[in-house]
């Protein structure tokens, strides 16, 4: 919340002003201006840098603490137009969110191979439908894997071109 305060200002009174007066006429100011204002905090460069340092340190600590809860981002397609998951082979902790992001605008999806996931995991609950596609650059699909083991996943339209990846859940 911001507050605004005004200062008391005394306006001087001018007497003896006449229109068309000669240059030798004098202007009389019977009162002087007085301003009452709240004291202004004075910052030194040293204090400012100290404050900036504290903000930077606090931001870094927040980022480190939040990084454990952040999602791992996997790009669907390379900047060079390659049909690949980037990274293609990675590890996450159980319960960590994985976000797959369409990088290049080609239609992609993420399907987990039911024959290459841990026993007891239902591939249909963690996969996109083979008919569903992330068509535009920036579109995402997120999944959280809680069972430890190795999971193989692929992009259905580009599996034949080698767009396959692996994640190990620790």
UniProtKB/Swiss-Prot annotation:
What cellular component GO annotations does this protein have?
chloroplast thylakoid membrane
- Targeting signal (transit peptide) range: 1-71
**A Pfam family hit:** Copper-bind
Q: Where, in this chain's numbering, is Cu cation bound?
A: 108, 155, 158, 163
The way it spans or sits in the membrane comes to: Peripheral membrane protein
Q: Which domain of life is it from?
A: Eukaryota
Per its UniProt record, the required cofactor names are: Cu(2+)
Enumerate the spans annotated as Plastocyanin-like domain: 72-170
Q: Report the GO molecular function annotations.
A: copper ion binding; electron transfer activity
For this chain, the family text in UniProt reads:
Belongs to the plastocyanin family.
NCBIfam families listed in its UniProt record: cyanin_plasto
Per its record, how is this protein called by name?
Answer: Plastocyanin, chloroplastic
Whose protein is this, by species?
Solanum lycopersicum
Q: What is the lineage of its organism?
A: Eukaryota, Viridiplantae, Streptophyta, Embryophyta, Tracheophyta
């Amino acid at each position: 919340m911001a507050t605004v305060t005004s200062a008391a200002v005394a306006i001087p009174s001018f007497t003896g002003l006449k229109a068309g007066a000669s240059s030798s006429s004098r202007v009389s100011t019977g009162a002087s201006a007085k301003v009452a204002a709240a004291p202004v905090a004075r910052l030194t460069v040293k204090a400012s840098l100290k404050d900036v340092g504290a903000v930077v340190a606090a931001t870094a600590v927040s980022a480190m603490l939040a990084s454990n809860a952040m999602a791992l981002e996997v790009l669907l397609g390379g900047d060079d137009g390659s049909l690949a998951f980037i990274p293609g082979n990675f590890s996450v902790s159980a319960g960590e969110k994985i976000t797959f992001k369409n990088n290049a605008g080609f239609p992609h999806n993420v399907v987990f191979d039911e024959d290459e996931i841990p026993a007891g995991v239902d591939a249909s609950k963690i996969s996109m439908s083979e008919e569903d596609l992330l068509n535009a650059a920036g579109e995402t699909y997120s999944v959280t894997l809680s069972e430890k083991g190795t999971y193989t996943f692929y992009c259905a339209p580009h599996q034949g071109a080698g767009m396959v990846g692996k994640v190990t859940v620790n």
